[in-house]
Amino acid sequence: MVDLLNSVMNLVAPPATMVVMAFAWPLLSFISFSERAYNSYFATENMEDKVVVITGASSAIGEQIAYEYAKRGANLVLVARREQRLRVVSNKAKQIGANHVIIIAADVIKEDDCRRFITQAVNYYGRVDHLVNTASLGHTFYFEEVSDTTVFPHLLDINFWGNVYPTYVALPYLHQTNGRIVVNASVENWLPLPRMSLYSAAKAALVNFYETLRFELNGDVGITIATHGWIGSEMSGGKFMLEEGAEMQWKEEREVPANGGPLEEFAKMIVAGACRGDAYVKFPNWYDVFLLYRVFTPNVLRWTFKLLLSTEGTRRSSLVGVGSGMPVDESSSQMKLMLEGGPPRVPASPPRYTASPPHYTASPPRYPASPPRYPASPPRFSQFNIQEL
């Protein structure tokens, strides 16, 4: 009986849904537009003297969001690992309208760090109104061509747990203020772009986590999920941040050129949408059409990417920069490491994939039982000195 019911629904539900949506879409769009217009003019949250905690605030979208909240007169708590960059952002935020700004050097993938900076924010200001999670880490490599798998945990830790931990710690205080969580997601959570497999997986987990949490909170704490395509940020160049703050840049020698969009405009849209109480902020909106293709005609996406990526030759990935404590060139919008002591360290060995030995062997184990990934020694930022600038 169940099999018969499923067979009938498989035949009836898809076309029936498309017919209903065709008739309901204009009405739903009008309702959404009317609600947005009303909230814009009559129900926008006043951020004057409100407290906003922003992770990943040292650069890119986090930095621009800090400036937008500063223009609205908010009190800011800027969190990132690069303390020097936080000082620069703090000074500018003060100049353009922020009442008070404190900076805290911390690592969002460590629960103790998250508990520390949220607690210090509450001790200093007495409340938390908005938590903005922007810390993110992207990549532009083909999964099977990666030689160093130690980057895998970093991608998932920062893109997923780097949002979950601050949210978990901040929720009790957000309940007290009926506050809001702002999430930096991406269209890659449902658009399967090549060379972004782990990033897409992490963003998909992130969006599903917050959509579920939205129902659990039942409106007591708002959630705004910001999804974007390619924007002009460090991440659009494949930037990585290693655990100790060193950065590296992957360069795919056979990648499709992609130009970033206006980062400042997206930040302005995010803050405006959060203050209106929007569930989603999308930039650009036309990316939504790809979701329809994925649901109803997934082969179209596959053919499109196959056409875009088809070329002659062998795929090759090279590591442009990696290290610890090396100077960073910030003269351009996409930060690149300036390697000390010679040219970039590009392996001169033969291609990684050969006919032998087999890619997977029974021994030794791929992941050794020791040492643990996160050493027991004190983290890089063991002191969290609140500094008002």
UniProtKB/Swiss-Prot annotation:
Residues 365-378 have a biased composition (Pro residues). Its EC number is 1.1.1.-. Residues 337-381 are annotated as: Disordered. The active site is at Y199 (proton acceptor). GO terms for molecular function: oxidoreductase activity. GO terms for cellular component: membrane. Keywords: Lipid biosynthesis, Lipid metabolism, Membrane, NADP, Oxidoreductase, Signal-anchor, Steroid biosynthesis, Transmembrane, Transmembrane helix. Gene3D superfamilies: NAD(P)-binding Rossmann-like Domain (3.40.50.720). It is a single-pass type II membrane protein. Its main location: membrane. The chain crosses the membrane at residues 11-31. GO terms for biological process: steroid biosynthetic process. NADP(+) binds at residues 56-82, 107, 199-203. Substrate binds at S186. Disulfide bonds: none annotated. Belongs to the short-chain dehydrogenases/reductases (SDR) family. This is 11-beta-hydroxysteroid dehydrogenase-like 5. It comes from Arabidopsis thaliana.
